[in-house]
Every structure is written in C-alpha cells, then in structure tokens.
C-alpha cells in the first residue's frame, strides 16, 4: 500500500510524544521532588536520571525540531512532583513557570499541546503516605492536582489525558516491572477509574464551558489473537482482551467490570456501587491507545490454580508478544473498539519501535515499522474506525525501561551536551508529513517485550 498524509482526513492530527520523567531531567532541581517511577527508570536503564535528556533546559530547541519535522501536535506529561512537590498543597512557582513557558512556546510555533496528567510518576510523598494507588485518598489528591492543571493551563490546552496506560499502571510494580500480586492490581485499577472519572466530572462542571476542551483516558492495548486454531486458545484470547482492555473500558461504557473478570477473580475484584457505576459511565470524550505489538495467546487452564496469583494467572493464558504490526494487529484492535465499544474517538497516543542505542541515526527498521503501522491504521479507518490522531513514540531518545531507544532524534546519554541528531526516521516522518508517499508490505520486527 502506498500512503501519504493526504490519504488521511484534513483534520487528522499527526504528532509525537514524550513523558516528563523520561525527557525533562532536572530531577531534583527548582523544587521538584522524587518519584518511584524515576527510581525505576534509573535502575532499569542504568542512566543518570538527574540529567536525563535535559528537556527541562532544551525545550525551545526541541520545539524548533518539532517545527522542522512538521508535527501538528506534541504529547507530553506534567510532572506532579514538579508542579506540586508535596503531592498536595502549595504549587511550585518554578514548576508552574516552566510548564507555562513550554506550552506558550509550543503554541507560538503552531504545535498543539496534548497533555497527560499522570504518566506513572506519583510523588514519593503520596506513596509514603498511603501507598499511592492503593489508597482511596489518591482519588481526592489526583482530582486536586488535575484542578490546578485545568486552571493554570486549560486556556491553552484543549486535549487532556488523565492517566497513561491505566491498565499497565495498575498491574505492574515499580521494582523490576513484575506483575502485582493477588488483589493489588484490581484495587489500583479501581482507584484509577474513580480518579479518572472524578477529574472528568470536575472538568466538565467547572471548565468545559469556558475552555471547550476534551478529556480522556489512555490504555496499553495489544491486539490479542489465538496462537493456534484450537477453540480454547480463541476463548483464552478473548479472556486476555477482557483482562487488559475490557478491565478498564467496560466500566467506562457499561459501568461494570467484564463478566470474565468477575468469574475468574471472584471476591478479589472490587465492585462499583450504583452511584459509582453511573459516575464512571461515559466519563471520556476520547480514548488514548498505546499500541506496539500483537500478542499470541495460548490457553493455560492450570495457571489459575497458582498460589501466587497475578493478573496473568487469573486470565489463565500464556502471552507471546509478536512484533509484526503491518498486518491485522492495529487494524484488529481498532475494529474491536468500533465493534464492542460503540466506535469511540481514538487517538493512537504511542506507537513505536525500539532499536539498540548504539545503532545511532541509521534506523531503517523504525521506518519500516511505522510505515506498516500507518497502513494498518488506515485500513481500519477505511472500515469505519473512528481514529482522530497518531502520535509516534518517541520524539527524542529517552530514558527507557529497557536499554533501547525509540526516538526520531538521537540523544547520546554519554554526551554532556545531550546533542539532538535527526535519525533517518525523523527525515522520513518529515517527508511523510509534507505529503510524500510511503509504502510498505507486512513488516516484521522484533520486540523486547
């Protein structure tokens, strides 16, 4: 298939993105406090987070690179611990100034800001006070944080995402990235859903009329398919969908968890009161989707009997991530949202391909990956999927959980200047966004997941 930007609707948004903890650096400067996610990134990447890639100081340079690339929009997150260092209470003037300056710089240069409120980085003060997501206080504190953001930035920011990868955030630990045990992921997920709905209610009641913005939630969403033609693998694939996507989406659409979760998890799964069910239903204007790979699923009926229960043992399935995305995977995922959830507006908020850092700027495999992804997404859109935008991940090489890079622009973390250099993929994306055609078959790439 040969595609250009001209094959997409005129109002379709093309962008790229990063997150605060992975791009800003200045980890404990100008009043900012620590977060568990930043400690996790430091351990897993082996890099010094305090300097990072220096987005905090190089934001004007980075915005000019966005202009050169031709981005419509840029997705980034606001560091809760930079804006409100105590997690609650006084706003940090220097943090407020930084985000105001950054947003103004984007808009001055014709780049639309898309803001994520929470990208895994809960302030350590709140983790210490009530173990973060496990405490019901999280709902109140997150809503107060969102209120500050809406008040201070909402006159210029029209697109808000409450929580990044709500399902992964609920289920994964920040020690070695393992799955949370027993009841923990379900309690965390429950509180995330309630906190999200609370922030949406606040925005709609207090700010929507004057700011006219849109607000949604983000999910990590692989497309799960049976590993074999065996009927049990097909049933297991649907369970995997229910345990990852349906876990969050069904409450937002129907006010209830999927029947699969109720059956498999039993009393360990929290329940919504009648009032909460009404509260969370329809609490979004769009859904953000982070999609990287397809995942083959094999039935594993014995795993649910494990004494060491996790979300994976509960779903009674073995998952095998696959890197081929040029075929049906993104298409299948988007058509699932269309079929099962009433075709909500979707933004692909992360779609990226890892390469070893030492590869430098020669990343032809990334071009192949993104070309295939765009073709798969375009196929879904031709079939009626309501996709509104596509954000490549990531704009720059960042601090990542694995020692790989996803960026359009190379950043050498050993170079004290943190120089940005365009990769082949940056030049490709810029040409695509100018309307030049790109074509690709069914790309096959490897994945570290």
Curated annotation (Swiss-Prot):
Binding, a beta-D-glucoside: 22, 119, 164-165, 292, 350, 393, 406
> Which InterPro entries does this one have?
Glyco_hydro_1, Glycoside_hydrolase_SF
Q: What Gene3D superfamilies does the database record attribute to this sequence? A: Glycosidases
Which tissues and organs express this gene's product?
A: Mainly expressed in flowers, flower buds and young leaves, and, to a lesser extent, in old leaves, stems and roots.
Q: What EC number(s) are associated with this protein in UniProt?
A: 2.4.1.-
UniProt keyword terms in alphabetical order: Cytoplasm, Glycosyltransferase, Transferase
How might one describe the protein's use in biotech or industry? Answer: Soapwort saponins possess anticancer properties and are also being explored as enhancers for endosomal escape in targeted tumor therapies. They may also serve as precursors for vaccine adjuvants.
Which coarse location class describes where this protein primarily resides?
A: cytoplasm
**EC category name:** transferase
Query: What GO CC annotations are associated with the protein?
Result: cytoplasm
Q: Which GO terms describe its biological process?
A: carbohydrate metabolic process; saponin biosynthetic process; triterpenoid biosynthetic process
- Its biological function? Component of the oleanane-type triterpene saponins (e.g. saponarioside A and saponarioside B) biosynthetic pathway, leading to the production of natural products with detergent properties used as traditional sources of soap.
Name by which UniProt lists this protein: Glycosyl hydrolase-like protein 1
Biological source species: Saponaria officinalis
């Amino acid at each position: 298939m040969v595609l250009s930007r001209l094959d997409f609707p005129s109002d379709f948004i093309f962008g790229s993105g990063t997150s605060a903890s992975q791009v800003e650096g200045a980890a404990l400067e100008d009043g900012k406090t620590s977060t568990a996610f930043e400690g996790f990134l430091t351990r897993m990447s082996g890099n010094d987070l305090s300097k990072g890639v220096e987005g905090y100081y190089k934001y004007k340079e980075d915005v000019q690179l966005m202009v050169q690339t031709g981005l419509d929009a840029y997705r980034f997150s606001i560091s809760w611990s930079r804006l409100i260092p105590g997690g609650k209470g006084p706003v940090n003037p220097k943090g407020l100034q930084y985000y105001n300056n950054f947003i103004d710089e984007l808009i001055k240069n014709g780049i639309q800001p898309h803001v994520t409120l929470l990208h895994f980085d809960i302030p350590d003060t709140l983790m210490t006070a009530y173990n973060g997501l496990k405490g019901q206080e999280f709902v109140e504190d997150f809503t107060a944080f969102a209120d500050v953001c809406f008040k201070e930035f909402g006159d210029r920011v029209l697109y808000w995402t409450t929580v990044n990868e709500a399902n992964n955030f609920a289920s994964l630990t920040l020690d070695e990235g393992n799955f949370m045990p027993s009841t923990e992921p379900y309690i965390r997920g429950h509180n995330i859903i309630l906190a999200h709905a609370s922030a949406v209610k606040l925005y709609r009641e207090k700010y929507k009329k004057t700011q006219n913005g849109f607000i949604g939630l983000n999910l990590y969403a692989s497309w799960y398919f049976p590993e074999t033609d065996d009927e049990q693998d097909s049933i297991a694939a649907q369970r995997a969908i229910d345990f990852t996507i349906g876990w969050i989406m069904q409450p937002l659409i129907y006010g209830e968890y999927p029947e699969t979760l109720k059956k498999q998890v039993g009393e360990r799964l929290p329940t919504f009161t009648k009032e909460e069910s009404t509260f969370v239903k329809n609490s979004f204007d769009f859904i953000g989707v982070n999609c990287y790979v397809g995942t083959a699923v094999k039935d594993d009926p014995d795993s649910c009997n494990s004494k060491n229960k996790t979300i994976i043992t509960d779903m009674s399935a073995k998952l095998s991530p696959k890197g081929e995305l040029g075929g049906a995977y993104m298409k299948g995922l988007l058509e699932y949202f269309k079929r099962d959830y009433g075709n909500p507006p979707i933004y692909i908020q992360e779609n990226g391909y890892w390469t070893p850092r030492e590869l430098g700027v020669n990343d032809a495999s990334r071009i192949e990956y993104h070309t295939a992804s765009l073709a798969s997404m375009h196929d879904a859109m031709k079939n009626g999927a309501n996709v509104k935008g596509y954000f490549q991940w990531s704009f720059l090489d960042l601090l990542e959980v694995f020692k790989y890079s996803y960026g359009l622009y190379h950043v050498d973390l050993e170079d004290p200047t943190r120089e940005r250099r365009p990769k082949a993929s940056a030049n490709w994306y810029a040409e695509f966004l100018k309307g030049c055609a790109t074509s690709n078959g069914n790309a096959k790439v490897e994945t570290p997941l």
